[in-house]
């Protein structure tokens, strides 16, 4: 499908990963924004939002999430009464509601306050460290891997290529010594001196550790670190110290109000005891991967049930938003939790532990997609090039580009480990699948070709990533840059003879495939089929070696 004998690589890890990016890109391209309105009012300098009744779709989604939580052994979310007004789909509907409540008093109907605890963030495995570094410092997964590998070689951090966030019990007695070695963090480690360190099951669990434990400092004083290394070491050190601090205690307040039978709601959060949050500075500056928008501290005034008074209502125009493009951080998470991309429960379970790829190989997979010019970077966003998009669209075998194939193989490999599945049978199945895929490609007579994207890579003055590469048609070379470090200039691609401006082969209408469909002259059983570069026999997988170059008939 390539041009000028260009090799287009696929693989059970790189192709599903590319498909994630392409499918997200197509979702964004095909997204049609919908207009809606929000009714809000301000009472005592606090903004309340009208409660909107959930749609049938939202209720089904919540039920599915609860099922997944139960299956994972977690407590499902408590079902709430589905009340409130219907979604405001038109400005006229919103204006009528606004007039209905404008001159009536706002009354507080309920005030609830709940206290809760928040445990420290988990220690780092390789993927979570790569995610955090991409979010905080815009480091690529490959850059982070090289940095943490360097820290390991300098003996200031433990083995990096790990997929667990836990420590084994035998590490616990060593922790006081490690903390003592973190001299630059004495402000945080001194309060722990002479105390019995917390030993949480969320940190120390032998059953969650195999060959290596989570990434932590070794206790050796870091010297001669680069700025990038120091930043990454700081993340690791603070995470490690935080797990020995008490939970953060907070209070969540929910206040309900009503105007003319239309219910309103607001929530607030107050930090009671910061606990481990002091390690990360301000309460909102903790280093957690996924933070809810309403997680910042928001202290509400003291409301009393039954109070009422004037308010200022307003109507706000809103538009539904498309999904966000993948960044390296969100792509790594998607690769890790690929179980969400398949419907089969057994396959999902197999993927929970392994995802797409392994922690130690995911950075290399993303780099491969860059090197193949399947993706490029625009700021932090990963964008599929025309080559990447067309490659995914041209692959007919869904298994090759879905997380399901990885799940099937991982599941069977686990069964082989347990001696409940035959390894020889697994190999035969792989051979059969490969034969079928190859036959499918050989019998594809569509003459479709993929636009080969070339890029000129430039390095900026400080040696960091340059501008994002732009695509260029095979017959229209354009000089542009791509965010890789090495400065290399790509040669323009010359279209193959007969190629159109779009890269598709133009065939003469008078040409006919005179041999295609005839009985194979070598084995006498199969029929001649048209391959990519020559004619072959349909019985090739059974050993027939017939081959005839194009134009020699």
Where are the language model's segments positioned?
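Eukaryotic nuclear/nucleolar intrinsically disordered, charge-dense low-complexity regions
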Residues: 154-157
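C-terminal or mid-to-C-terminal helical accessory/interaction module adjacent to the motor/catalytic core
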Residues: 1-43, 114-117
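Beta-strand/loop nucleic-acid-binding surfaces
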Residues: 50-53
């Amino acid at each position: 499908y390539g041009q000028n004998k260009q090799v287009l690589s696929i693989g059970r890890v790189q192709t599903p990963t590319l498909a994630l990016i392409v499918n997200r890109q197509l979702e964004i391209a095909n997204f049609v924004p919908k207009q809606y309105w929000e009714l809000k009012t301000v009472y005592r300098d606090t903004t309340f939002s009208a409660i909107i009744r959930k749609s049938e779709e939202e209720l089904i989604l919540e039920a599915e999430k609860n099922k997944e939580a139960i299956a994972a052994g977690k407590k499902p979310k408590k079902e709430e009464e589905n009340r409130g007004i219907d979604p405001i789909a038109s400005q006229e509907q919103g204006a009528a509601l606004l007039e209905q409540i404008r001159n009536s008093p706002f009354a507080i109907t309920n005030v609830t306050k709940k206290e809760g605890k928040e445990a420290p963030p988990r220690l780092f495995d390789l993927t979570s460290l790569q995610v955090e570094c991409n979010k905080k410092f815009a480091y690529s997964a490959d850059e982070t891997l090289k940095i943490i590998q360097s820290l390991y070689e300098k003996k200031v951090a433990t083995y990096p290529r790990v997929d667990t966030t836990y420590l084994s019990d035998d590490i616990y007695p060593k922790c006081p010594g490690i903390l003592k070695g973190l001299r630059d963090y004495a402000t945080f480690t001194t309060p722990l001196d002479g105390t019995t360190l917390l030993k949480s099951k969320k940190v120390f669990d032998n059953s969650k550790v195999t060959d290596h434990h989570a990434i932590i400092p070794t206790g050796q004083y870091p010297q001669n670190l680069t700025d990038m290394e120091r930043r990454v070491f700081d993340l690791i050190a603070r995470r490690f110290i935080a797990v020995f601090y008490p939970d953060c205690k907070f209070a969540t307040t929910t206040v309900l109000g009503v105007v003319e039978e239309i219910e309103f709601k607001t929530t607030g959060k107050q930090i009671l005891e910061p606990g481990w949050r002091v390690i990360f500075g301000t309460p909102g500056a903790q280093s957690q991967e996924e933070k809810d928008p309403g997680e910042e501290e928001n202290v509400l005034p003291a409301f009393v049930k039954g109070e009422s008074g004037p308010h200022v209502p307003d109507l706000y125009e809103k538009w539904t938003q498309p999904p966000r493009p993948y960044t390296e951080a969100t792509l790594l998470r998607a690769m890790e939790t690929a179980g969400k991309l398949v419907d089969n429960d057994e396959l999902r379970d197999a993927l929970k532990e392994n995802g797409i790829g392994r922690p130690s190989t995911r950075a290399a997979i993303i780099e491969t997609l860059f090197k193949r010019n399947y993706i490029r970077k625009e700021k932090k966003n990963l964008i599929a090039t025309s080559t990447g998009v067309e490659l995914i669209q041209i692959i007919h075998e869904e298994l090759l580009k879905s997380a399901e194939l990885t799940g099937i193989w991982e599941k069977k490999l686990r069964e082989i480990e347990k001696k409940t599945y035959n390894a020889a049978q697994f190999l035969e199945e792989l051979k059969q699948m490969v034969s079928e895929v190859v036959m499918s490609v050989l019998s594809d007579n569509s003459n479709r070709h993929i636009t080969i994207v070339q890029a000129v890579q430039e390095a900026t003055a400080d040696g960091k990533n340059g501008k994002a590469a732009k695509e260029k048609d095979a017959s229209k070379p354009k000089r542009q840059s791509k965010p890789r470090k090495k400065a290399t200039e790509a040669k323009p691609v010359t279209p193959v003879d007969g190629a159109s401006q779009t890269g598709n082969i133009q065939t003469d209408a008078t040409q006919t495939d005179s041999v295609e469909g005839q009985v194979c002259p070598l084995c006498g059983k199969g029929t001649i089929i048209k391959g990519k570069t020559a004619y072959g026999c349909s019985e090739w997988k059974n050993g027939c070696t017939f081959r005839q170059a194009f134009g020699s008939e």
